[in-house]
Amino acid sequence: MKKGSAVIKTLRVILSALALCVATSSAHAADTKKVDVLLVGGGIMSSTLGVWLHELQPDWSMTMVERLDGVALESSNGWNNAGTGHSALAELNYTPEKADGKIDISKAIEINESFQISRQFWAWQVKQGVLKNPHSFINSTPHMSFVWGDDNVRFLKKRYEALQASPLFRGMQYSEDYDQIKQWVPLMMEGRDPKQKVAATWTPIGTDVNFGEITRQFVGYLKTQPNFTLSLSSEVREISRNADGTWHVSWVKLHSDEPAQSVDAKFVFIGAGGGALHLLQASGVPEAKDYGAFPVGGSFLVTENPEVVKQHLAKAYGKASVGSPPMSVPHLDTRIIDGKKIILFGPFATFSTKFLKNGSYFDLLKSTNTHNVAPMMRVGVDEFPLVQYLAGQLMLSDDDRFNALKEYFPNAKKEDWRLWQAGQRVQIIKRDPVKGGVLKLGTEIVASQDGSIAGLLGASPGASTAAPIMLNLMKKVFKDKVATPEWQQKIRQIVPSYGTKLNDSPAKVVEEWTYTSDVLQLSPPPKIDVNTPSQATGTAPARPAKASADMAL
């Protein structure tokens, strides 16, 4: 009998403890702040999604959590990227030469179409007062391709001729004339051997973009809204699924003794740049198991000498050396950062195991697990030229980098230039049923099956296409909402070309160029023949050329 009483007593203690735990848990759940949307990361992607959602569903509550002491301090920061408004006007890796010698322009059309969506999105935000003074974040900067040598000149001419099939590229000019090119970029031609065979394309509709400034203005606007909260110096430590399908996310305030904070969010977006993969893995969603990552950094030579800077107004892209990946493509770039004009040359690849410039040296190790280690090793074998290139880059001396600059700027003086370490770019490695693992280009949206959590992986073309990338994300995770007449009407108001292919209509191209150039205070667009229909389909080729890694700086 005594034994039975002891068992009952023990059982009561256990049940009481369980009841206390349940009560505590219920009280905790009741006290935890509830939000419709949690944005992890304070960069261009999260801020763009925040503005999109505020436009489409202004009654939704949002919280943004950023690990650093301010927004736009990582990859979106103007000093951590080249600020190119990527539209395939100059970047030769978007137009590979196929085995039959023809130039494939399908990727170039896709990239350009995407950037036109970004231009329209920014123009709308200027009209609404969300973005102030367009010159603070976007400026007309001609985009050009510049090559030398018979084979490269031949390639560039074929590229130019192929692109003329699309109205998106008909504002482009081509020249092999020394004097003409000197008019476009005097700094690049002075001191050059006049007998050297060179060629260039020149497109005046190109832009330089300060993505950090766009981010700061977007977040500055969101902070004025009553249902938006920003938490800085906040590092996410836990992401777990609640029984009701929402996500419980906890973070700690760095440099502070404040207790951990948390929210229960109906939807979580992880826009943490290089930190996104680790957080997706921490969430436990099976979709994250398909991915691994490899970090590549970039450095630039920088000059702020006004006598040098005033001689160059262009983003001039070259061609990668034979056997080198596209990330080795150097470019001599005009930049306008916080109102000051400078010139960057690079990038030169660097390596660190960090996934973020302000990350941890353990990032690569922490992201590697039993699910992705085999695909990562497979890519290391298949992409050996990339490994060789990185090894070679790490061995470059200051003289090597300066000699590379002199190929573009023959009269460069060493004392005018300094080396700047830019941001980290994390290349996506995805499990492949046939190859084991493949290196993925571009950005990739990784979302749970129910659409309650999503993250963005990858780099190229990155911030330039934040608006269309976030639009595609919303189509994936808010499919039913996007299909409603209310959202459809609003999206078309923000992006007039939504649902159409500008490539198919020269008249629409001119209309969009004119509208966005006017609102964004850019140079008037070039005149093109609207009566000549597009001869480019923009569809992917049946036998695409082998893709290579792209650092997208």
Curated annotation (Swiss-Prot):
Q: Which GO terms describe its biological process?
A: tricarboxylic acid cycle
- In which pathway does this enzyme or protein participate? Carbohydrate metabolism; tricarboxylic acid cycle; oxaloacetate from (S)-malate (quinone route): step 1/1
Gene Ontology molecular function: any one: L-malate dehydrogenase (quinone) activity
The enzyme's main class, written as a single word, is oxidoreductase
Cofactor(s) essential for the protein: FAD
Q: Which domain of life is it from?
A: Bacteria
What EC identifiers does the entry list?
A: 1.1.5.4
The record lists the catalysed reaction(s) as: (S)-malate + a quinone = a quinol + oxaloacetate
The keyword Flavoprotein is assigned to this record? yes
What SUPFAM superfamilies does UniProt report for this protein, alphabetically?
FAD/NAD(P)-binding domain
Region annotation (Disordered) ranges? 524-553
**Which keywords appear in this protein's UniProt record, sorted alphabetically?**
FAD, Flavoprotein, Oxidoreductase, Tricarboxylic acid cycle
For this protein, the record's InterPro entries field holds: FAD/NAD-bd_sf, MQO
For the keyword Oxidoreductase, the answer is yes
Family statement: Belongs to the MQO family.
Q: Which HAMAP family match?
A: MQO (MF_00212)
Specify the protein name: Probable malate:quinone oxidoreductase
Organism of provenance: Burkholderia lata (strain ATCC 17760 / DSM 23089 / LMG 22485 / NCIMB 9086 / R18194 / 383)
Starting at the broadest rank, the lineage of the source organism is:
Bacteria, Pseudomonadati, Pseudomonadota, Betaproteobacteria, Burkholderiales
Recorded name of the encoding gene: mqo
